[in-house]
Amino acid sequence: MWLFFGITGLLTAALSGHPSPAPPDQLNTSSAESELWEPGERLPVRLTNGSSSCSGTVEVRLEASWEPACGALWDSRAAEAVCRALGCGGAEAASQLAPPTPELPPPPAAGNTSVAANATLAGAPALLCSGAEWRLCEVVEHACRSDGRRARVTCAENRALRLVDGGGACAGRVEMLEHGEWGSVCDDTWDLEDAHVVCRQLGCGWAVQALPGLHFTPGRGPIHRDQVNCSGAEAYLWDCPGLPGQHYCGHKEDAGAVCSEHQSWRLTGGADRCEGQVEVHFRGVWNTVCDSEWYPSEAKVLCQSLGCGTAVERPKGLPHSLSGRMYYSCNGEELTLSNCSWRFNNSNLCSQSLAARVLCSASRSLHNLSTPEVPASVQTVTIESSVTVKIENKESRELMLLIPSIVLGILLLGSLIFIAFILLRIKGKYALPVMVNHQHLPTTIPAGSNSYQPVPITIPKEVFMLPIQVQAPPPEDSDSGSDSDYEHYDFSAQPPVALTTFYNSQRHRVTDEEVQQSRFQMPPLEEGLEELHASHIPTANPGHCITDPPSLGPQYHPRSNSESSTSSGEDYCNSPKSKLPPWNPQVFSSERSSFLEQPPNLELAGTQPAFSAGPPADDSSSTSSGEWYQNFQPPPQPPSEEQFGCPGSPSPQPDSTDNDDYDDISAA
């Protein structure tokens, strides 16, 4: 059993790799040659807290930790061996010793580093080399007992990286130190992955922006890299694939970067940029500053870094309104607040705090209040005039473009309205009369005053009624037809004289308004039409005392309303057998209406020709002996047989007057 436990312990010790404890009187040394180093493996030595992996404090790995090498036993052979092992060329002629360790350890360098907490470096390891190669070196534990300095070296092929002209160590133009000279990087194929490598190498977090050339001030000196193409996993920028700087890439194409740990400040809510609430841009967002430790030293550093002089007043702030909160603690000698001790989103340090505010000496409002010798009104006008003029110039330029646009729009609208109005006027002048004359003609004629019932008279469209003329048939033989002693008279030699008739009386007067509404000329022979209708009443034959049968075309001869019948050779026969039919106004009205609705194609009885246009009705003076006359009387009474008789021989009749030969028509 005891044998089993012993074998198990030996196997455990062998697998763990711990060396067997050395005697108390002998130092525990481990040769570098005992640990085989092959390419690709990580060396047990490194340089930290420098500008690159080729300069800084020498650290060696002991078991699972990194320990700084003792500076008391540091020599040139060890420095040369370390620089060659790290691929940084040879060491510089004079090796430098590290200063005494400060009370507070420096911030950790890039990579997985750990710093010993020993303040006196008691028992620190030492690197002892017998030649300028790494295989001739060995690490001795607890070699230094009282020396408090650390070994430090700068190799000849030192490479460094920095960001300049960006307002801090974590933003600006990218520059590399190569062959002892600082140079820039060309922005060809420069992207966010390349900027990530830069920010991580400098300990500034991650990249927020990868900026092209001319965003920052152009650099000077050579251009060390062109077409850099990093994957984002490289530890150093010079480990990324790329090309050496060419001559065709100038400083106008210098690449830049802004890292998440970069801090920039501003003052808001004041009269100008030198007064207001303190805000810091950190990790891509704006944050407020806690006033729990906002003292004159912190305010002084901020005002100086902003170029606003010194701090004059620290007014009480408002509650925090932004997402993040930053805490600063300065001694007053720092260049920027980022060089002070700071904490971000620490609830303990910023509890029950408000947003910090500051008033710097370069503020315009403070300058106006602190110069009583200059009138405030004059100072205000002088300072604000420059700003006001810029605003007015901008607004005036906008107004100069706006006002002509409005005027042109109004003119265009007015011209369109005017053109539309002119077109409507032209259309109404030439098109409306045609529409009225051809499409909206009146269809009825108002009845006369003697009509007791409305008599609609339909007139065909576009057919104007002409005076109806009945051409009297020429007598075959005026001398042989009757014993007329009338002389032949040419009626066309002397125009007839218009006399006052029933048609032109007051009862048939058509006013001007009715004429304008009707828009057509009324036919002048309305009374003639009435007489023509009335001619349906049969008359007696003077020779044989036989009533003539009524014909479809009643015998009607146009005569003047003022004609005077003085013929003495005509035979008149009033036969008692030809009694007048009883008066029927309705029948007469219907016959009149139907007659007027018919087109004026009238025919005389017998072999009379159709109506034709001839002289006016007023020109007919019926003096021929061969004409038949019919005298109409309003409503007639049935006469007795004694009043009718056939005369034996014709005898000259006395001259009849107008009142005897013509009766007024009173029937409607």
Curated annotation (Swiss-Prot):
Residues 18-37, 471-490, 537-668 are annotated as: Disordered. Disulfide bonds join 54-88, 70-144, 83-155, 129-137, 170-204, 186-249, 199-259, 230-240, 290-350, 303-360, 330-340. Changing residue 662 to F: Reduces tyrosine phosphorylation. Reduces affinity for LCP2. Impairs activation of T-cells. GO terms for molecular function: identical protein binding; lipopolysaccharide binding; lipoteichoic acid binding; protein kinase binding. One of its GO terms (biological process) is adaptive immune response. Detected on thymocytes. Detected on peripheral blood T-cells. Detected on natural killer (NK) cells. Soluble CD6 is detected in blood serum (at protein level). Detected in spleen, thymus, appendix, lymph node and peripheral blood leukocytes. Expressed by thymocytes, mature T-cells, a subset of B-cells known as B-1 cells, and by some cells in the brain. InterPro entries: SRCR, SRCR-like_dom_sf. Residues 424-668 are cytoplasmic. It is a single-pass type I membrane protein. Glycans are attached at residues 28, 49, 112, 118, 229, 339, 345, 368. Residues 1-17 form the signal peptide. GO terms for cellular component: cell surface; extracellular region; immunological synapse; plasma membrane. Changing residue 298 to A: Nearly abolishes interaction with ALCAM. The modification Phosphotyrosine is found at residue 662. It is found in: Cell membrane. Cell adhesion molecule that mediates cell-cell contacts and regulates T-cell responses via its interaction with ALCAM/CD166. Contributes to signaling cascades triggered by activation of the TCR/CD3 complex. Functions as a costimulatory molecule; promotes T-cell activation and proliferation. Contributes to the formation and maturation of the immunological synapse. Functions as a calcium-dependent pattern receptor that binds and aggregates both Gram-positive and Gram-negative bacteria. Interacts (via extracellular domain) with ALCAM/CD166 (via extracellular domain). Interacts with the TCR/CD3 complex subunit CD3E. Interacts (via tyrosine phosphorylated C-terminus) with LCP2 (via SH2 domain). Interacts with VAV1. Interacts (via glycosylated extracellular domain) with LGALS1 and LGALS3. Interaction with LGALS1 or LGALS3 inhibits interaction with ALCAM. This is T-cell differentiation antigen CD6.
